[in-house]
Amino acid sequence: MQLITERLFLIPLQPDGMRTLLARTTDPELIQPYTDMLDLSLAHPEQWVWYTAWGLYQNDSGDWVGDLCFKGLPENGQPEIGYGLLPEYEHQGYATEAVRAACRWAFEQP
């Protein structure tokens, strides 16, 4: 599964991808949230895409731009999303583009 936008493709990370992300994470503030995402995605295999991180990659280069996550299943039809970008990709509209695509996808789900 992937979502494609004008400049990005978004892929929900499988458990191995989450483990790789955790191993590469140097920001101590992200280790626990990423660990929680991995644990919750494993605990909810039928709805794992709502609990895992989604990698954000540039369409043209395939470079990692950042990630976003849903904070579990939407409550009352309203998804909650968190996101982070590498500093060199901030202030260029990537987060807006990714969040729009993720919300569009979320609202299409039953």
Predicted features along the sequence, with ranges:
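GNAT-family acyltransferases
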Residues: 1-80, 85-88, 101-109
